[in-house]
Design a protein with these regions (language model features):
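Active-site loop architecture of trypsin-fold serine endopeptidases
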Residues: 107-120
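Acidic, glycine-rich catalytic/binding loops that coordinate metals and/or anionic ligands
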Residues: 6-14, 93-100, 118-151
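Surface-exposed, glycine-biased beta-strand/turn segments
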Residues: 1-71, 100, 109, 146-151
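Solvent-exposed coil/turn segments that connect beta secondary-structure elements
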Residues: 47, 77-79, 110, 125-129
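Active-site acidic-Proline motif in GNAT/NAT acetyltransferases
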Residues: 44-46, 89-90, 94
Length: 151
């Protein structure tokens, strides 16, 4: 487990074919209702493939009508949890080992994104402060700015 702390943690944009123009670089930790936006929204056409930002193990998938809608949680090196939300489809399952080339889902507008432009909400949580991070007392969680981690 300790060796996992020292493996690479640099990530790729998880939405296939998307670059810096697909998200607002100031959206991380931007005021969002009664809290802060804990990640970034990457806008793309509905159905665009979503890849893991970095390889890891899928620890959970969920289909719900509120919040993140169809979502996936992947554990990676550095003890980081990568959250992918508002997916139109989930193409993986809990326990799957995924690489950057795997397709885990498709961009969508599920959950509280219904009726809004299709996008992937992507965030990174951790138990170890690393890089550009913020503490969220509401969830007692450390969130890392994904933009600063992308290659």
């Amino acid at each position: 487990m300790a060796i996992g702390m020292f493996l690479p943690t640099k990530i790729q944009n998880p939405v296939e074919g998307c670059g810096k123009e697909s998200y607002n670089p100031k959206s991380f930790w931007h005021p969002w209702g009664d809290h802060k936006h804990r990640g970034i929204d990457i806008f793309a056409r509905k159905g665009t493939p979503v890849h893991p930002a970095i390889g890891g193990i899928v620890v959970a998938t969920a289909h719900n009508k509120g919040a993140g809608g169809n979502c996936i949680l992947v554990l990676s090196s550095g003890l980081r949890l990568h959250y992918y939300a508002h997916l139109s489809e989930i193409d993986t399952h809990a326990g799957a080992i995924v690489s950057r080339k795997s397709i885990i889902g498709k961009v969508g507008d599920t959950g509280n994104a219904k009726g809004k432009p299709a996008h992937l909400h992507y965030s990174i949580a951790t138990i170890i402060p690393q890089g550009d991070w913020r503490w969220d007392p509401k969830f007692c969680t450390i969130f890392i700015n994904p933009i600063k981690e992308m290659e």
